[in-house]
Amino acid sequence: MNLKPLADRVIVKPAPAEEKTKGGLYIPDTGKEKPMYGEVVAVGAGKMSDSGQLLAMPVKAGDKVLYGKYSGTEVSVEGEDYLIMRESDIFAILA
């Protein structure tokens, strides 16, 4: 992937949507819920503080993160779907 986020932005590869229910029924594309977690694939340099210092990003490539249902902007690069979001849109790092 040739995509480098700027400032405090993060690129996340969303987890795949569930294909079937726990009971074994297949879910059509129109009924699938958007996943709210994924893997960070790239991180910007960070945000500038009011005093001019560069604040380090708390997430890094490879982290599994939890984010809001409507967070980020969807982009497709080389046939793969990604979300570009601000670091503040990420709720937690999954351990």
Swiss-Prot record:
CC per GO annotation: cytoplasm
A biological-process GO annotation: chaperone cofactor-dependent protein refolding
GO molecular function: ATP binding; metal ion binding; protein folding chaperone; protein-folding chaperone binding; unfolded protein binding
Tree of life domain: Bacteria
Gene3D superfamilies given in the database record: GroES chaperonin (2.30.33.40)
PROSITE patterns: CHAPERONINS_CPN10
UniProt-annotated location(s): Cytoplasm
Keyword Repeat in annotation: no
UniProt xrefs under SUPFAM superfamilies: GroES-like
Major subcellular site: cytoplasm
Keywords: Chaperone, Cytoplasm
Record-linked NCBIfam families: PRK00364.1-2, PRK00364.1-5, PRK00364.2-2, PRK00364.2-4, PRK00364.2-5
Family: Belongs to the GroES chaperonin family.
Function: Together with the chaperonin GroEL, plays an essential role in assisting protein folding. The GroEL-GroES system forms a nano-cage that allows encapsulation of the non-native substrate proteins and provides a physical environment optimized to promote and accelerate protein folding. GroES binds to the apical surface of the GroEL ring, thereby capping the opening of the GroEL channel.
Record-linked PANTHER family: 10 KDA HEAT SHOCK PROTEIN, CO-CHAPERONIN GROES
Subunit text: Heptamer of 7 subunits arranged in a ring. Interacts with the chaperonin GroEL.
Protein name: Co-chaperonin GroES
Organism the protein comes from: Chlorobium luteolum (strain DSM 273 / BCRC 81028 / 2530)
Taxonomic lineage from the root: Bacteria, Pseudomonadati, Chlorobiota, Chlorobiia, Chlorobiales
Gene symbol of the encoding locus: groES
